[in-house]
Amino acid sequence: MDIFREIASSTKGENVFISPATISSVLTILYYGANGSTAEQLSKYVEKEETMDKVSAQNISFKSMNKVYGRYSAVFKNSFLGKIGDNFQTVDFTDCRTIDAINKCVDVFTEGKINPLLTEQLSPNTCLLAISAVYFKAKWLIPFKKEFTSDYPFYVSPTEMVDVSMMSMYGESFNYASVKESFGNFSIIELPYVGNTSMMVILPDKIDGLESIKQNLTDTNFKKWCNSLEATFIDVHIPKFKVTGSYNLVDTLVKLGLTDVFYSTGDYSNMCNSDVSVDAMIHKTYIDVNEEYTEAAAATSVLVADCASTVTNEFCADHPFIYVIRHVDGKILFVGRYCSPTTN
């Protein structure tokens, strides 16, 4: 959560969407070639790939790609290449066609949703370029019916309002909790997808209450809040939205303590014999949240439609909120902030 908090703090008023899981994956690749304090700092973000493999195998709407491009004139150690396999490729960074090739690869992989990835010519001094790309488009286990979607006011601030396409469902049972903390009160709800992932939406009681929640959004707190959820019949209203994210993570990670990882301070002597530096870490994301549902999910919603009369709660995301997409084992795959409908 620390990467999200840092990015959200530096981009106030903007939508944010990142994938901590894929960022950890590409940092793990760098860890394989690191030594000394560089390896020590990177070890904080090294995680097993097992969860990502499970998601990829069971949810065909999830795609992630991590790549490390190295300068063709550098000789990389076999021990390093053996650990990263197909995630590594040597290129000529001085050739303008290199950017086109990288962009084409990402474009095809993400079905045209992330293009272009690189928008500027790389420096001829570039030795290494690390990239993580992710595409996520999932179907709800319980669908939002399109006939219930309508224009609805979204409060960007207590004094500013814009209309959004608000998806609605009535009388369904979701895991839900109303949380009271010293830094603010909020609601949290779990909206499951088909497969093995779900979206957790954290909605402050106050229109302008998201900042304090963001500041206190730690892995420990998030797990505590999720453990407080209980099955509740509830009306749900959430905006229909698309969000893209584009970040160079170097400055963010340096602020978080990875001071010996980038530029000339990085020790990658386990990667190659010559001096190399990580000059950029590009992270682009895309998410599409809409009413889409599978036939099986639609049948499920019909089975409980007669419960609408028992609803005593309402979850209406008509002001800025945080959303977290996680695997059933608790691993966080994505985290985002939705606060600016006009930038969709």
From Swiss-Prot:
Top-rank taxon: Viruses
GO biological process, one term: symbiont-mediated suppression of host apoptosis
Keyword DNA damage: no
Keyword field: Host cytoplasm, Host-virus interaction, Inhibition of host caspases by virus, Modulation of host cell apoptosis by virus, Protease inhibitor, Serine protease inhibitor
Localization: Host cytoplasm
Parts of the chain that traverse the membrane: none
Family: Belongs to the serpin family. Poxviruses subfamily.
Name listed for the protein in its UniProt record: Serine proteinase inhibitor 2
